[in-house]
Structure formats: structure tokens, C-alpha cells
Amino acid sequence: MQTVSSPKQKLNFGQRLLTLLQNRDFMVSLVLTVVLLILFRVLAIIPLPGIRINESVLDRNSNDFFSLFNLLGGGGLNQLSLFAVGISPYISAQIIMQLLSTDLIPPLSKLVNSGEVGRRKIEMITRIITLPFALVQAFAVIQIATNAGTGSSPISLANSGSEFIAFYIIAMTAGTYMAVFLGDTISKKGVGNGITLLILSGILSQLPQGFIAAYNVLSGIVITLTPQLTAAISFFIYFLAFLVLLFATTFITQATRKIPIQQSGQGLVSEVKTLPYLPIKVNAAGVIPVIFASSIMSIPVTIAQFQPQTESRWFVEDYLSLSTPVGIFLYAVLVILFSFFYSYIQINPERLAKNFEKSGRFIPGIRPGNDTEKHIARVLIRINFIGAPFLTVIAIIPYIVSYFIRLPNSLSLGGTGIIIIVTAVVEFISALRSAATATNYQQLRRNLAIEVQQTAKQDSLEQLQKEAPGIGNLW
């Protein structure tokens, strides 16, 4: 008789992989995801008509505005492609909707608590808000592009007439909605979070070129060794530091503080380990504080580039630029403040306390209601004293390295990119594990049904043999 393994048994990597390969629906979803990501990358490297790329100044690091939106947009900004603005306007709209969906605007707060219908309305409003963001960002990119003659922009337009500018703005805005459509399709019919995977594809596509550029820059460091040995040793240290930061970021991203939860009427539980728990991540705010801080610091510097050489421009470049110690310090302060602020919005202790009270759940030793809210808030503040400084260190490392070494920001370690890489990969692996677990349960159910049928047939045959002992000899 076939034995059925327990569904509680954990699958190893080989078993998960074999289970997924046997799942036809999953393989179709995986192929769809890969095809859409390839389509996104192909369209991201094809410039729009009439674009002239200035290879001599093609430097992602020449402007913080370019660097941030090229990262969030999916890497299409360098070529001024259809996806030049990418999904960064949609991300900005999502962040604003999250902020407004708190108690700031009660109608939006009600929509958040209205289930699937409310979620769809929130998504529709988010896409409407995306439009002005896309138009403004596309216009800003075009303005920088048309001023490429100053040497501050890596791109320029062959024709800067008003009709061409309008065409580019409309095309890049349409590209934003097309990128959002691709991301939604991956999320619904593919594997993983589509928006995150689009951003990840842009970052990974630039990694090889970034490593080569870093090797070339590091080979120029003057050491009393041969140039080849100097470059090899420097790049080995660089790559090793990259891996260390990658693993450290993964550890902090996965680290959680578990708050035990008990259901009313469940009775006393002797061991807290057996209770369900509320997981609060050490880095509950994710990458959003870094995006906020980068945006605030890059806006005045970008505007100053279009101003004449005045005292105000010198002040911005001397004190707000991320290439100066004062600018780096202000950037670090903003990241810490936004980490505490946004993590509180993400967790929302008040809403959690109300939901616990409505569902009859409570934290052992803590009274429901206001005491529960204060307890969750205290826990959140304590873990933020770990998560916020770590996030700040990761965010400022590129600028510190760039300040002390001749390594450009975009080639330095850490920053928004490494956090997005870790977050996207962790989400994708979680999606694979969930799919493998679901497939395993389906197989277990089928095997169990077959075993039940076989057992029923065996029992019926044994019953017949008991009632008529000679029936077995008739066959």
C-alpha cells in the first residue's frame, strides 16, 4: 500500500525544485514571468526616435535625479527609452496613497478596511495619481536632456521643438502605464511581485557593467605593486565587501520580533513558543525611507544645476550635495527620521490593537485596547533603534566611499540598489516556496484520495470473502 508523507514535513531544495517542475501551471507562470521581464528589458534599452546618446558623458552618477529615477524606473533612463521614467511615478503614487490612507483622510481609511472592493478603488485612485507624477517626471527628464550641452546630462535630443518634447512626454508617460501593466500581469499570472521584479531586472542588468567600471577605477589606485595585481586585489576586496553587505542586508531584512498572540477562550498556554505570533520586521519601513531621503536631497541639487553661478547655488552644492560631509550627514538624519515615521505608518499599532480587540485576540500579559497599542508602539521603537541605523549605514556607504576614494556613487557598495535586490530576491524565493508547498499539498491530496479508494476496495473485498468464503475461488 502506498504511504502518504505528512504535509508537515519540510521539503528540501531538491524536493521543492522537483515538485515545481512537475507543476504545469507553475511552469507556465514562470515562463510568462521570464518573457515579460525580457520584453521589459528589450524596450528599456531602445531609445525613442530622435534621441542622441552622448557616450562621453553617459554617466549615471552625473546627477542624483538621474541616479534615483533610473534605479526605480527599471534602468531605462540612460537610453531615454519608452521606459525612461518607468514605474517610479507609480511607486511615488503608492507611497502617497499609503500615507493618506491613514487617519489623515477618513474616506481613504475606510476604503482600506473595505476588503477587496476597497482595495480595487485604492488601486484605481493610485493609477490616477500616477498620471501627474509621470507627466512631471517626464518633463523634468526632457528639460535635463535639452540642457545636455552644458555637460551635466548624459543624453540630448536631436530636435528640441515643442512638438517633439510633447511627443517624448506622452511616450514616456504611456511607458509608465505599460510598465505598470507588465508588473500587474506578472503579479497576477506570473511568479512573485511584478513591480519589484521589474526594478530588480534593471538593477541586475547594470551590475556587470558596474563591476567592470569598478575594476577599471580601482586599477588606477596607486600602490607599490604592478597595476594588474593592484586591480585584482582591490577588486577582490570590493567584491568581498559587496557580498558581506548583501548577506548582512538579507539578515536584517529577514529578522523579526515575534509578539505572541492568544485567542480569547483558548485557555492558559504553558509554553509561549506554541502560540501564534505577530511578526514585526526589524526593518519594517523597507527601502521607502531611503527613497524619501534621496528624493528630498536630490531635488534642490537638480534645480540648482539650471541656475546661474550665484551664492544660493554655491550654498546648495556645498551643503546639500551628497558629495559633501554636510550633505551626507543631513541625508543620514533624514533616513533615520523617515525610518521611524514610515515604520509606524506601516505597522499602525492603533489599527492592530483595534483589530485584536474586535477578533478577540490579545497579547498575553497586556490588556486589550490602549495598553496593547502602547506595547506594540514600544516594541516598534525599540527594534527601530536597530533597523534605522543599519538602514542608514547601508544608504550612506556609497557616498562615504565616493568621498574618500575616487569611486563613483553608482559603483560604490550599498545604497537603495542592494536593499531592493535583497527584498526582491527574498519575495521571489518566498513565492517559490509557497508554490512548492501548495503543489505538495495537492499531490498529497491526490495520493490520499487514491489510497482511500484502494483501502475501500480492499475492505469491500475482505467483507465479501467473510460473507461467502468460496467467492475467492470463483476467480
Swiss-Prot record:
InterPro entries linked: SecY, SecY/SEC61-alpha, SecY_CS, SecY_dom_sf
GO molecular function, one term: signal sequence binding
Any GO BP annotation: protein transport by the Sec complex
Subcellular locations according to the entry: Cell membrane
Segments passing through the bilayer: 26-46, 65-87, 128-148, 163-183, 194-214, 232-252, 284-304, 325-345, 385-405, 411-431
Species assigned in the record: Mycoplasma genitalium (strain ATCC 33530 / DSM 19775 / NCTC 10195 / G37) (Mycoplasmoides genitalium)
The entry's keywords: Cell membrane, Membrane, Protein transport, Translocation, Transmembrane, Transmembrane helix, Transport
Subunit structure: Component of the Sec protein translocase complex. Heterotrimer consisting of SecY, SecE and SecG subunits. The heterotrimers can form oligomers, although 1 heterotrimer is thought to be able to translocate proteins. Interacts with the ribosome. Interacts with SecDF, and other proteins may be involved. Interacts with SecA.
Similarity annotation: Belongs to the SecY/SEC61-alpha family.
Name by which UniProt lists this protein: Protein translocase subunit SecY
Bilayer disposition of the protein: Multi-pass membrane protein
GO cellular component terms, semicolon-separated: cell envelope Sec protein transport complex; plasma membrane
Cited function: The central subunit of the protein translocation channel SecYEG. Consists of two halves formed by TMs 1-5 and 6-10. These two domains form a lateral gate at the front which open onto the bilayer between TMs 2 and 7, and are clamped together by SecE at the back. The channel is closed by both a pore ring composed of hydrophobic SecY resides and a short helix (helix 2A) on the extracellular side of the membrane which forms a plug. The plug probably moves laterally to allow the channel to open. The ring and the pore may move independently.
